[in-house]
Amino acid sequence: MSTFVAGGNVSANGIRQHYLRYGGKGHALILVPGITSPAITWGFVAERLGHYFDTYVLDVRGRGLSSSGPDLDYGTDACAADIPAFAAALGLDSYHLLGHSMGARFAIRAAAQGAPGLQRLVLVDPPVSGPGRRAYPSKLPWYVDSIRQATVGMSGDDMRAFCATWSDEQLALRAEWLHTCYEPAIVRAFDDFHEVDIHQYLPAVRQPALLMVAGRGGVIEPRDIAEMRELKPDIQVAYVDNAGHMIPWDDLDGFFAAFGDFLDHPLV
């Protein structure tokens, strides 16, 4: 039985924020996807999270059905500030925060800025690039080329050239929704991967945090984990050995197993 409750919109931090809600009961959990992942593409993950949490999946500004266009700020600080504003708009006075990739960077920044009610963070394979650091392994044309094709119109089969290991259903959904990713927002986020050093904010994160590392992602290396442990000594680390950067797409069971009991009870 589906745990999907409803979609909705709230006005928060000066923009329209669209979300999908799953579960509807239990402790609140906000899920912030990655750079070109509208909320609906995380539905297969949220369906399972909905068995355990009152789950809200965000369309980050410039993506999906949230506010978009040339007049918005798509920088890290603005996107991070959207998260506690969203929680406040919905009256979520206690919640966990799960971020993947770009969303994990925003989660770190939001926690460091101060996020009332935030209890625990799950940081799924966040890019660790930044000034003076090695580049993020994915390249900007991979994103831009696929967005431009989706804007014209593309099929799931067309999308296979960009995501060769995905299922037909996953490819079709991405092909359907990728055109909602506003190209300047994506470019700004990608640039911030290299221009904003997210490590600087870790010492200000007071909440317990779990770092989930993709074993085949090429994003986080042992030296990165060591540095993050120096900056936040209590950070927990879990590995999904057989997954690439898009962990749930490669190993959904491994993704949920990696939570352990960090969120108070196992998710398997």
Curated annotation (Swiss-Prot):
Transmembrane portions of the chain: none
Recorded superkingdom: Bacteria
Effect of D125A: Abolishes deformylase activity
EC annotation from Swiss-Prot or TrEMBL: 3.5.1.106
Residues of the AB hydrolase-1 domain: 28-251
Active site: S101 (charge relay system), E221 (charge relay system), H245 (charge relay system)
Major enzyme class: hydrolase
InterPro entries reported in the protein's UniProt record: AB_hydrolase_1 (IPR000073), AB_hydrolase_fold (IPR029058), AB_hydrolase_sf (IPR050266)
Role summary: Deformylase that catalyzes the conversion of N-formylmaleamic acid to maleamate in the aerobic nicotinate degradation pathway.
Written domain comment of the UniProt record: Shares some sequence similarities with the AB hydrolase superfamily.
Name of the protein in its database record: N-formylmaleamate deformylase
